[in-house]
Design a protein with these regions (language model features):
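RecB-family 4Fe-4S metal-dependent nuclease core
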Residues: 1-302
């Protein structure tokens, strides 16, 4: 009997975290264009990170994280604006690599950790390939007219803020906005933004860049948007523009802006629940969500 009583004893209670409900005073008044992806990915993790300011613990890794890797690439690539007419691949590559070396020396000193050295070798290969693609672009009539252009534009009660990596103008007057991407695999803009079978937006970055440019330069005419991909497989380095014409005939640009308005309305209304399911190895908040049941509960007023 004693044994059965022991076996029937309840499991020890697990302490669970219940974050405070959204305080209207803490809701963001400004949103970066890239923040929309975070909300679409998981409203509740957006709330933890961008409203409550929670951050995952630093594991002390001695390597460059993806954001830092991208920053180094951006800093080097920004120097192309100083020589808009230059179309010599070797000279362009030398310029990019010299700027990278200067930044690395400042950030890591003369002896970077071995993991960083390996990453920098990959980045050098990507920048050399970028020089080739950029040279082709110049020969085709494109010129850089702006890099790292900051913006702040009103959008349905909030401010959209951010920086546009690069704006090009063609000899015939066409404009395009390019976002540098250093993900290992080359990215197709429409695939990274929209899932047609589900009619689901998973990112709004490029449509919002187009909207921002139209607001800031209403007389400039239509502007294309796309990625300048710098993938690990350097042979696939390329510029990829986003096509807003859906097979159904729908104008995906208008649909993207409508979804962006919905996101802003949800944030302003304090809608951050429920959390999305994510793989633990891709979740910076895995400690909170990885348990069964999760260690986190829906925010509610006391």
């Amino acid at each position: 009997a004693a044994h059965s009583a022991a076996s029937a004893a309840p499991a020890p209670a697990v302490w669970r975290l219940r974050p405070p409900p959204a305080d209207p005073a803490r809701l963001p008044q400004k949103l970066s264009v890239t923040a929309f992806k975070a909300y679409l990915d998981c409203p509740f993790r957006f709330y933890l990170a961008r409203v409550l300011g929670m951050e995952p613990a630093d594991d002390g890794a001695r390597e460059i994280d993806p954001a830092g890797f991208g920053t180094l690439a951006h800093e080097a690539l920004a120097t192309l604006a100083a020589v808009p007419e230059l179309a010599d691949e070797a000279q362009l590559a030398a310029r990019l690599l010299a700027e990278l070396d200067r930044r690395v020396q400042t950030r890591f000193g003369a002896r970077p950790p071995f993991a960083v050295v390996v990453q920098l070798d990959s980045l050098r290969q990507r920048l050399a390939a970028a020089a080739r693609v950029h040279a082709e672009s110049v020969r085709a009539g494109w010129r850089i007219v702006a890099v790292e252009e900051p913006f702040a534009v009103a959008f349905h009660g909030l401010q959209l803020v951010g920086r546009i990596d690069r704006i090009d103008r063609h000899a015939d007057g066409r404009l395009r906005i390019l976002d540098y991407k250093t993900a290992d695999g080359g990215q197709r803009p429409l695939e990274t933004h929209y899932q047609p079978r589900l009619k689901k937006w998973i990112d709004l970055q490029l449509p919002l860049y187009r909207h921002v440019h139209e607001q800031l330069h209403p007389d400039a005419g239509p502007v294309a948007v796309g990625y300048f991909n710098l993938p690990k497989a350097v042979a696939e380095t390329a510029i990829a523009e986003m096509d807003f014409a859906a097979k159904s005939g729908e104008d995906l640009y208008a649909a993207a802006l409508a979804r962006a308005r919905e996101v802003v309305a949800a944030i302003q209304a304090g809608v951050f629940w429920p959390p999305a399911e994510k793989r633990a190895d891709r979740d910076v908040f895995a400690l909170l969500f990885g348990a069964d049941p999760p260690l986190i509960e829906e925010p509610r007023a006391p």
